[in-house]
Every structure is written in structure tokens, then in C-alpha cells.
Amino acid sequence: MRAKNWLRYLKNFTLNKFTSKKIPYSAQIELTIRCNASCPFCSFPMMEENAISREMSTQQVKSIIDQISQLGVNSLSFTGGEPTLRSDLPELIHHAGVKHDLMIGVATNGYLMPKLFKENGKLNGLDYLLLSLDYPFKEQHDRTRGIKVFDRVMETIKLANQRDIKVILSTVVMKENFKYLREICELAESLNCSIEIFPCENIIRDFPNKRYIVKNVDNLIPDLSMWASTIDYLRKDFKNILTDPISVAVVQRGGFGGYPKYNQEILRCHVAEAYLFVRYDGFIDFPCKIHPIKSFNALKLPLSKIYNSLEAREIMNKHDDFEFCEECRLGCAIASSMPARWKTLASKFIMGYLRGNLK
């Protein structure tokens, strides 16, 4: 992370902690819900065509980026679906990372990244890739993702290293790949990659008139106590593991929710206030993209007005008191909440930086 990003974060942390002014620490723009893979734990392949057709235009996304920058956000990630399916991705990266000097990441399966690098050089403005890798072996990873992508992941890592772009491997831990976690960490280390290792989760995606649920996901989820003890053990041997002890404890103790007693007292969910999520169609969901109870059209309303609205603030103040928060163990929700508290910030990001994983 660049020094100016740390300074911007400290400014936002101070304002959020000691004043009535609130600023999200990070933002995500879901560029598309289209995907070229078919992972067994993901609902995107189930999405209907009429939903896919409502993607924001290039200019609409740029307008959102402008407002995210004006709001004072420190970092922005482009996700999907598969964001590399958008032909304007290099243009959007440049607009956000170069024009607005935001710290920029892209979450991708890697299938199209070699082509993007070769056609666009360095991809100016891009700081890091969050790259999916579930197995250290080609056949198993390709089978799980539903496309022949392993070789392209390896090529993406090589090209990113040549361009001084940080690569964070994202491993979804399932019963089948659990026994290969050491080999995955060894591969990540040999490739100069950091790695995030969270268990598979049953993600229900709610839309206004439709709920998408992947059947039999529970059959994929590993034993969480075994996962936790394995991560603790592996962290002793691999400094490139980003999955920190506090995140592990939050997952192991039941995740978010459990109001009024709560499943754990380590960390409340701060996603609604700390992480601004913009949907592919320009709507912003509160408290989160998984279970929106209030959605605002950011193509019609100013971003600052949405974020600072009374309705949004009331949802923020409830954190994970909602019934649907029960046992939420999403790695993205945990990581997005951690900058809101000094102790958790230190565990995840400061120690990650000192261990060399976030430089």
C-alpha cells in the first residue's frame, strides 16, 4: 500500500472515530453479473438475462467513480461476475487509479487477464489482483471452475509480477480441496503471491423479486474448527497468508449475528458504513449486497446524499443485529469491517503489511 493511502486511511479513521462525519474506507463496483465460469458455490450462472442487460454504461461507471473519489474513499475494487468481460475495464482502471489516485483492485478468475495485459501494457492505475485459485493442480482447479483457467492464472501471475502489480490468491476452502492447503500455500509462496484462505459459504443473493440460492452448498463447507486450526498452523510456516487470527476467530465462533447475545464479541459487522457497494445496475444496497433491505439508485441520486441519508445511517447503526446476519462468515464482510476498529485493523492490515503481504 502506498504511503498516501495510509495517510488517507488515517484521516478517514479519525473522522469516523471522533466526529459525526462518516466516510467509507473502501468501495466496490460490481461491473457485471455475467461470468465465464461455473463454480459450484456461486449463484451468478443462475442469473436471468434481463438482469444482465441492465449493466451501467462506461460513462455511468465513471460518474460513480468520480463521486466515490469526492466522498473521500481510499480504495476501490472492480468485481463481478467476472469484471474482465467488460471491454472498458482498462479505461475504468485508468480513470479510477490514475485520474483519481484511488488504490485499485480487480477480483478475477484470471481467464482473460493475460489478454488484457498483452493488449494494454501495464494497465496503469491497477495496484493488485484478487485471483481465484482453489487447487494447486490444473485438472482439479479447472474442473471446479468449469473452464480451463489454471494455465491462464499462472500466466496472469507472471505478467503481474513483471508489472509490479500485487497478486493476492483467493482460495475458497471446500471439503475436497482442504487437504491441499499446504500445497496451495507453497505454490503461492513460490509465485510471490499473498493468499487469502476462507471457507466456502452458503451465499443467498436477494433481489427485489427473486432470491438466488445454490443447492447443496452445505455439502461443500469444511469443518470450521479444522479449518481454523489448519490456518493457525500454516501461518507459522507461511508469511504470505493474509487470513489473520482475528478473522479466523470470528469465523470459528459463529460469524456475525446472534443478536442480542451475538455469536462472538470480537467484531461487529461494519459493512454498511465501511464498504460502499455499487451494484451492476447502479443501485446501492444497504446493509449489504447479499441481503438488501434498502436500495438507492445512484444513477439518479448523488452518492453523498445516499450514504449520509437518515435511512442508511439507521441501518449502519444496527450493524449485524438483523436476523439474516446470523452466522454470516463471509470473508469479504469480515475484511471490510476490520478497518473500522484499531485492534482489527492492526491484525489484518498492519501486520499484513509488516509481513510483506500488502506492499
Tell me what each language-model feature is.
Residues R2-Y128, A340-R341, K348, G352-K359:
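Conserved alpha-helical substructure of the radical SAM core
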Residues F18, I23, Q264-I266, F283-K359:
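Flexible mid-to-C-terminal extensions adjoining Fe-S/redox cofactors in radical SAM and related proteins
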Residues R34, E49, P83, Y111, ...:
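Residue-level marker for beta-strand->alpha-helix junctions and adjacent short loops that shape enzyme
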Residues R34, S38, R268, F324:
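The −1 position to Zn-ligating cysteines in a subset of zinc-ribbon hairpins
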Residues P45, T79, S132, F198, ...:
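Conserved residues at the C-terminal ends of beta-strands
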Residues V61, W227, L303-I306:
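Hydrophobic/aromatic residues in well-formed alpha-helices
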Residues K122-Y128, S132-D285, K289-A298:
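Radical SAM enzyme [4Fe-4S]-AdoMet core and its adjacent flexible, acidic
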